[in-house]
A protein has these predicted regions:
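Surface-exposed, low-hydrophobicity beta-strand/loop segments enriched in small/polar/acidic residues
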Residues: 1-146
Length: 146
């Protein structure tokens, strides 16, 4: 039988997408139901779904207002919330997200309505908070939702 893992990192990664990064005063979270059949990953921007208390990921072709960010749930069997699951959605406070373009601490954070990506670029995007850590394009940063 071949080994499953043959190399090990010296340390664990700093962040996991969707994680709550620290123990400061709690943020504000809502429990909402996942609408899409494909489910919704952790650390994703979400908006209002078709029905009350439903959410869907903000993505190309969806004209939905930003509600919050899905929070990591280690009880899920995959790296996402499946359809009909109750998702924890952060509406205020810190959460780790993947960024589009480089970001710096203190920079205003925006969600891109066409893609749902988080960016420091203001043009045509929706202000959602501030970045608390730096990250390169495609990296993970702490976003403090306001």
């Amino acid at each position: 039988m071949a080994p499953l893992q043959t190399t090990y990192a010296l340390t664990q990664g700093r962040f996991i997408v969707g994680m709550i990064p620290d123990m400061r005063t709690p943020g504000q979270d809502r429990s909402l139901n996942v609408e899409p059949a494909a489910g919704i990953g952790f650390g994703k921007s979400v908006g209002q779904g078709t029905a009350e208390r439903q959410i869907k990921a903000i993505a190309t072709g969806q004209a939905t207002a930003f509600l919050g960010v899905t929070v990591l749930d280690t009880t899920q069997l995959q790296d996402s919330y499946p359809q009909y699951a109750t998702a924890r959605v952060r509406t205020k406070g810190p959460v780790v997200v993947t960024v589009s373009g480089a970001v710096t601490p203190g920079a205003a954070a925006y969600v891109v309505p066409a893609t749902g990506a988080f960016s420091a670029t203001a043009s045509g995007n929706t202000l959602v908070g501030k970045f608390e850590t730096a990250a390169a394009d495609g990296g993970m940063a702490v976003l403090n939702l306001t």
